[in-house]
Amino acid sequence: MSDRQLTEIAAGFTYTEGPRWHEDRLWFVDFYTHSVNVVNPDGSVERVCTVEHQPSGLGWLPDGRMLVVSMKDRKVLRRESDGALVEHADISAHCRGYANDMVVAANGQAYVGEFGFDLMGGADHENGVVVLVEADGTSRVVAGGLSFPNGMCISPDGKTLYVNELFGNRISQFEIEPDGTLGPREDFASFGDLADEPSVEKRLAACTIAPDGQTLDADGAVWIADCVNQRAVRLGEGGTVLDEVSTAPLGVFAVALGGHDGRTLFLSVAPDFDETKRSAAREAKVLSTTVDVPHAGRP
């Protein structure tokens, strides 16, 4: 495990998620303060907007307007040039669970994952889907049968979508067709057998690596937040562990590469992902460290 220094970028939050490097600044959301935030060059943290029904994945349209997932009402919101938040897409018809992470392609098409079941309510596991949201806000399901689709990235050439399956012991990849639909699912990395178990606890216990958020680098490797092992892991195709960064005693739930040279790895960390505990405390942070290979792809 790499012995790297971790630097605190932002602190005093409930549950930080969705870090993105955009326009030379770090953006992230905080679940239970319902905030989208940006870290300014002087280190100050600015609240950009409030998402009443809990923010998650972030992205930007080609014209610069920001998209943000509104989890609990299963919508994608758009921030207009005057700062107003408006509905971009209602994907509730496609979702059994909360809407979650998102990646936006260069042409403005957005891919949004959903839980598949009521995780926080203690429901049994059911597979989830990936929803394609067009730039005009229309939407359709483009992939199913995924075990809690979570962090997603698009390759630098725009031809491959990578999807972390949190409870699936794997990272999946799909060829992106010219119209934005997806080809058949393939393994990018597999960490063991796919659990066939309704209990979330047993599924999580069976995961060698539990991939939450992800970010791509210029060598074609993927950094993932391994949310059960308090570490970020750099993986090659097939699942070979190339590098790792410990965040113990905190768990890490999302990662992003950025900084002036693309070699800063940002890590969203918190003691756990328990909604009751996290919403009642301000123990979440964003940390950073330096890695060797710079960012590539989207986000």
Say what each PLM segment does.
Residues 10-25, 51-70, 75, 93-110, ...:
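Beta-rich, blade/repeat-based domains predominating
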Residues 31-32, 71-72, 117-128, 166-168, ...:
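Short, solvent-exposed loop/turn segments at conserved positions within beta-propeller repeat blades
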Residues 46-50, 86-90, 140-144, 182-192, ...:
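Beta-propeller fold detector
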Residues 256-299:
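Blade-level signature of beta-propeller repeat domains, shared across WD40, Kelch, NHL, RCC1
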